[in-house]
């Protein structure tokens, strides 16, 4: 009878990425893999798109808010229903363990697993825990963290960033699409890549649209999240979404302009890619991106520019400063000890699962 593991996590791509790195390794080792999430969430889309042999189980989900809203009343019932559904799924599957990457949808499965005596392993990518993981931590066997947590928590293992990137550009798959893009770019101009993420692309899209003169100063690659903006013209490539092209585009760019999501930041760190961080503010997030950006700037990995300060003048100043000190930034990134390989984390997780099962 095959061993079973249940994954959960969703709401944004960042709450799915690590799961998609780990799942193939479990499948390769003969595990039966299941996933609990929202059928209308990005986790369902990403799992389907991956083509991996994973059984997806949909549950009801409600948003966890730190502020008063009448919607909280309705969401209490959704979360309760999600918990009942999770209990039923786990009781039926009887997995050896549950791994959660966080997000609102992950709380009911985590609680259900704990109630049924299953080991629970969770992961936190940001400088400080989000509300979902603050709740999940109470039910977890172990929490793995990308950043060292300021609070001394007994169940935390500081891991560093787990990222799957090609550090050598020669390892990346060739792309005829990328060659077509290069035909529209000038070798005399620096190439900038704007990555806004699922929650933050709009501001970058608008900034580029409002300042066509950027195309005279740089080659611009803009991952927009909006298919209506798709365009390939002189010094400009706008595309709504990329998968296989993602890392080749990063490698092609001289500098990346990004939000402050930890997954993207650590991918850029692993590739030692020069970058400017424009974090989402507290009006659009819980402030985690501000913390991540400040951490990266203090470590000497990057420079940050606050969204309200994103003017053409300030942007050009930031570009000039980054390119002037490019060698220093790259040397600091190359010397980092904060990156771990997927194989390292997989082996650690497998060992921790085995230990937890033996202790039951």
Swiss-Prot record:
Q: List residues binding UDP-N-acetyl-alpha-D-glucosamine.
A: 198, 289
Record keywords, A-Z: Cell cycle, Cell division, Cell membrane, Cell shape, Cell wall biogenesis/degradation, Glycosyltransferase, Membrane, Peptidoglycan synthesis, Transferase
Q: What is its main location?
A: membrane
Please report the record's description of how this protein sits within the membrane: Peripheral membrane protein
* Localization in the cell: Cell membrane
Q: What pathway does the UniProt record associate with this protein?
A: Cell wall biogenesis; peptidoglycan biosynthesis
Mind listing the GO biological process terms from this record? carbohydrate metabolic process; cell division; cell wall organization; lipid glycosylation; peptidoglycan biosynthetic process; regulation of cell shape
Which family is it part of? Answer: Belongs to the glycosyltransferase 28 family. MurG subfamily.
Q: Indicate what this protein is called per its UniProt record.
A: UDP-N-acetylglucosamine--N-acetylmuramyl-(pentapeptide) pyrophosphoryl-undecaprenol N-acetylglucosamine transferase
- Per the UniProt record, the source organism is Streptococcus pyogenes serotype M49 (strain NZ131)
């Amino acid at each position: 009878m095959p061993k079973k593991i249940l994954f959960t996590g969703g709401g944004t791509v960042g709450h799915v990425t690590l799961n998609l790195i780990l799942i193939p390794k479990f499948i390769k080792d003969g595990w039966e893999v299941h996933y609990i999430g929202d059928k209308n969430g990005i986790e369902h889309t990403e799992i389907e798109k991956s083509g991996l042999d994973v059984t997806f189980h949909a549950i009801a989900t409600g948003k966890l808010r730190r502020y008063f809203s009448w919607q909280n009343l309705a969401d209490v019932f959704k979360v309760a229903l999600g918990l009942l559904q999770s209990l039923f799924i786990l009781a039926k599957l009887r997995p050896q363990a549950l791994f959660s990457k966080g997000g609102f949808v992950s709380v009911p499965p985590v609680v259900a697993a704990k109630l049924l005596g299953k080991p629970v392993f969770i992961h936190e990518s940001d400088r400080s825990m989000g509300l979902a993981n603050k709740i999940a931590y109470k039910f977890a066997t172990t929490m793995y963290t990308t950043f060292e947590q300021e609070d001394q928590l007994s169940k935390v293992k500081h891991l560093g960033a787990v990222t799957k990137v090609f550090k050598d550009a020669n390892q990346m798959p060739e792309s005829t699409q990328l060659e077509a893009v290069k035909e529209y770019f000038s070798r005399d101009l620096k190439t900038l890549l704007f990555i806004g993420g699922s929650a933050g692309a709009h501001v970058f899209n608008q900034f580029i649209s409002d300042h066509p003169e950027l195309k005279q100063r740089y080659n611009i690659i803009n991952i927009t999240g909006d298919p209506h903006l798709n365009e390939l013209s002189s010094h400009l490539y706008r595309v709504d979404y990329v998968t296989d092209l993602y890392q080749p585009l990063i490698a092609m760019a001289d500098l990346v302009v990004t939000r402050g999501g930890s997954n993207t930041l650590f991918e850029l760190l692993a590739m030692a890619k020069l970058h400017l961080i424009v974090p989402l503010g507290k009006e659009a997030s819980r402030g985690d991106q501000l913390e991540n950006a400040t951490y990266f700037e203090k470590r000497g990995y990057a420079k940050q520019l606050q969204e309200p300060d994103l003017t053409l003048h300030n942007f050009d100043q930031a570009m000039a400063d980054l390119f002037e000190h490019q060698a220093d930034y790259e040397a600091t990134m190359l010397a980092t000890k904060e990156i771990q390989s997927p194989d390292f984390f997989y082996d650690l997780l497998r060992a921790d699962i085995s230990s937890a099962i033996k202790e039951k």
